[in-house]
Amino acid sequence: MAMDDYDDDMSSVGVTTARIENQHQQHPHQQGQHGHHQQGQGQSQYSAGAVKVGGWRYEDASRYIGEWNQRGQKHGIGHLQFADGTRYDGQFQEGLSQGVGCLWFADGAKYEGEFHQGWFHGNGIFWRADGMKYEGEFRGGKIWGLGLLTFQDFTHGFPRNEGFFQDCRFMRRRRCPEVVQRAQKCALMARSQCEHPY
């Protein structure tokens, strides 16, 4: 069988993510005394009445340490830890992951790269817990665009697929070294961004 004829179960990568957010979009200090987000505990530093940097532990056991905007939303650099062990370190904008960041899943999978409105979006690298690695373009939380998919072993047939992916499915072969390099650069920027004092 020629590589161009290759078609197996792994033409579908199986990477779809939930939007990186939790139910706590706002800092509890911005709500009224009986506001919905008042559960939890934390400490913050204030500047002219607005929360700038602080930490908060929510009732559902998730935690956030980082920067906030004047409306009480996660905004700037921060660390968000969910109760299941999933962790995001990186940039936030108005309560959602936005910019570059690193996301570690409880099952051992991880993503380093660009985010847009809470989704993997742009360029980055995703490692699945079984050793599969995708370096390339993402859209709306899915593998979508040009990229390189590799496996640590031959359990899924050919050890690499390079080309165009749509909705997590391998569509056609195409060399794309410039896209892979861009994904590697974004992942490196995300890793360096995650090295913060929180």
UniProtKB/Swiss-Prot annotation:
Keywords: Acetylation, Cell membrane, Cell projection, Membrane, Phosphoprotein, Repeat, Sensory transduction, Vision. Gene3D superfamilies: Histone H3 K4-specific methyltransferase SET7/9 N-terminal domain (2.20.110.10). phosphorylated under dark conditions and is dephosphorylated by light exposure. It is a peripheral membrane protein. It is found in: Membrane; Cell projection, Rhabdomere membrane. Interacts with ninaC. This is MORN repeat-containing protein 4 homolog. It comes from Drosophila melanogaster (Fruit fly).
